[in-house]
Regions:
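N-terminal secretory targeting modules
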Residues: 1-51, 112-115, 121-142, 148, ...
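Serine-esterase "nucleophile elbow" of acetyl-processing enzymes
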Residues: 26-97, 209
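Soluble or luminal CAZymes and related metallo-dependent hydrolases
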Residues: 65, 94-101, 140-154, 202-210
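Short, well-structured alpha-helical segments in soluble
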Residues: 100-112
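A structural motif corresponding to the C-terminal end of an alpha-helix
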Residues: 77, 150-167
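Surface-exposed cleft-lining segments at the edges of enzyme active sites
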Residues: 57-61, 88-92, 134-149, 196-202
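Histidine-centered active-site loop/cap adjacent to the catalytic His
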Residues: 194-225
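Active-site regions of enzymes building and remodeling cell-envelope glycoconjugates
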Residues: 162-165, 175-201
Length: 225
């Protein structure tokens, strides 16, 4: 089985300077041959890959990839030469179901075995249509919470034998049970966007903060440093 499908086929092994809400044209977004934002291609035989999943936040939209928390984490761990493998879909309006489906795609690869999974969850009210590459909001909070609980159980089952951590940026503000927000693998639920840009994406201070948090959590849970 190959790596997950990108929704940015047109940029595979290429780049763009305008994407989603970033129409400034000042950042060069490099896409690898798998079609994901990164400065390296992916190898199914890589044993030290830290795989990152999420939304435009994990894709570091608005900033060079080298300022992303994913890149900083891989370069800030000294025990091994870790590589950051980004599987977030740029500025696509992905929902948590899409994010977990991507995690599942990686988990089901027979030859590729990530060292760590880092999962960024997004608003519980999002609904993504892969066929149309578009999304919308669902306004029923009860329905959103019920759907998310099922999705999270799936995530737990997928990664029960793996090294993994997660955090959430849920703009919907839905009250989520403590057994999720206080889960041992939860880094933080709704981290503050201590710097923002392009209307609603976090800036460099946020990425610095999250990289430190992720590194501390990896040390706490798995003695990875």
């Amino acid at each position: 089985m190959s790596f997950p499908k990108t929704y940015y086929d047109e940029y595979t092994s290429s780049y763009c300077t305008k994407i989603g809400q970033d129409m400034r044209g000042i950042i060069k977004y490099n896409f690898n041959k798998q079609g994901f934002i990164n400065n390296q291609d992916y190898d199914i035989n890589e044993e030290n890959a830290i795989c990152f999943f999420g939304s435009a936040i994990t894709s570091s939209i608005g900033l060079p990839w080298e300022q992303s928390f994913a890149f900083q984490v891989s370069k800030g761990l000294a025990s091994k030469e870790f590589k950051s493998y980004n599987f977030s879909q740029g500025c696509m309006f992905v929902d948590n179901n899409e994010i977990i489906n991507t995690v599942e795609s990686i988990k089901n690869m027979k030859q590729f075995r990530p060292a760590v999974y880092v999962v960024q969850l997004i608003g519980l009210d999002r609904r993504f249509n892969p066929q149309h590459k578009a999304g919308k909001y669902n306004l029923d909070d009860n329905e959103n919470l019920t759907a998310f609980m099922d999705i999270f159980k799936k995530l737990e089952n997928l990664l029960k034998d793996e090294k993994w951590i997660f955090f959430a940026c849920d703009g919907a503000g839905i009250k989520v049970p403590d057994d999720i927000t206080m889960h041992q693998n939860c880094l933080i639920w709704n981290p503050p966007f201590i710097s923002t840009m392009l209307r609603d994406v976090p800036g460099p201070k946020f990425h610095n903060m999250m990289s430190l948090g992720i590194k501390n959590k990896l040390k706490e849970l798995y003695n990875i440093e």
